[in-house]
């Protein structure tokens, strides 16, 4: 039986990073989202950070109002973000760790250590009909706790694997890859839907697309950088093609 289709979520955070570097309204992350969808994206991801360093509150409202595909709202588990997410009512919320000092999300949520704090946020989002995902490492204890907390989805943090691949650290890349493969299977067997993201490029997206347990990839920084050279629509089409090549081997 062929594997289920693999969805592509395009993260538009770094369109907003470019805009905010100069101020004003351009480039517009909502326009980027619309172009990405037209070119074949299955959904849009945006991370509203507490310091508003890229995506702003009004961007989230406009994305929800203007795009025709599912909106995945990445956020820290705080009361302020909960209020905004319940007002925005995106298709999905992905709970992520967040530190003001970090340049990008540096690791996965510690679901094991923070399960008591996370549980009420997961329950409220579930009750509101918003699909909840937890951004975690491919660690058995974290995956098992995610299932116990009744989060229907996990997103596996692929950053360590992608960095090792790019840096040519073959042994580390192989070890991280084995963790991802095992983690995706464990999560699927536990009844979780499995997504993946962070640091993916054409090559690593094609590789991970061959894992039938993974249903969605969320990719942003690489695609926005590549779009500077070939355009966003072409980048989305090329990423979609890379994913499809990988999926054909699942």
UniProtKB/Swiss-Prot annotation:
Signal peptide: none annotated. Keywords: Cytoplasm, Pyridoxine biosynthesis, Transferase. It catalyses: 3-amino-2-oxopropyl phosphate + 1-deoxy-D-xylulose 5-phosphate = pyridoxine 5'-phosphate + phosphate + 2 H2O + H(+). 1-deoxy-D-xylulose 5-phosphate binds at residues 13-14, 49, 54, 104. Its main location: cytoplasm. The active site is at residues 47, 74, 198. GO terms for biological process: pyridoxine biosynthetic process. Catalyzes the complicated ring closure reaction between the two acyclic compounds 1-deoxy-D-xylulose-5-phosphate (DXP) and 3-amino-2-oxopropyl phosphate (1-amino-acetone-3-phosphate or AAP) to form pyridoxine 5'-phosphate (PNP) and inorganic phosphate. Belongs to the PNP synthase family. This is Pyridoxine 5'-phosphate synthase. It comes from Bradyrhizobium diazoefficiens (strain JCM 10833 / BCRC 13528 / IAM 13628 / NBRC 14792 / USDA 110).
């Amino acid at each position: 039986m062929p594997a289920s289709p693999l969805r592509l979520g395009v993260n538009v955070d770094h369109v907003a990073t470019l805009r905010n570097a100069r101020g004003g309204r351009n480039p517009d992350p909502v326009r980027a989202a619309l172009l990405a969808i037209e070119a074949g994206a299955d959904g849009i991801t945006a991370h509203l950070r507490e310091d508003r360093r890229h995506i702003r509150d009004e961007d989230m409202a406009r994305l929800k109002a203007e795009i025709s595909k599912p909106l995945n709202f990445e956020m820290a588990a705080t009361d302020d973000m909960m209020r905004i997410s319940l007002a925005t009512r995106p298709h999905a919320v992905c709970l992520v760790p967040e530190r003001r000092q970090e340049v990008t999300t540096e690791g996965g949520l510690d679901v094991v250590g923070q399960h008591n704090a996370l549980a009420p946020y997961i329950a409220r989002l579930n009750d509101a009909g918003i699909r909840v995902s937890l951004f975690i490492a491919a660690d058995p204890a974290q995956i098992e706790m995610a299932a116990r907390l009744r989060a229907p989805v996990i997103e596996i943090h692929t950053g360590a694997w992608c960095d090792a691949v790019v840096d040519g650290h073959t042994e580390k890349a192989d070890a991280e890859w084995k963790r991802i493969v095992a983690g995706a299977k464990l999560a699927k067997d536990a009844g979780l839907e499995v997504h993946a993201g962070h640091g993916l490029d054409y090559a690593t997206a094609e590789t991970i697309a061959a894992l039938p347990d993974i249903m969605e990839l969320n990719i942003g920084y690489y695609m926005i950088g590549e779009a500077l050279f070939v355009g966003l629509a072409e980048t989305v089409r090329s990423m979609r093609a890379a994913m499809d090549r990988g999926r054909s081997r699942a």
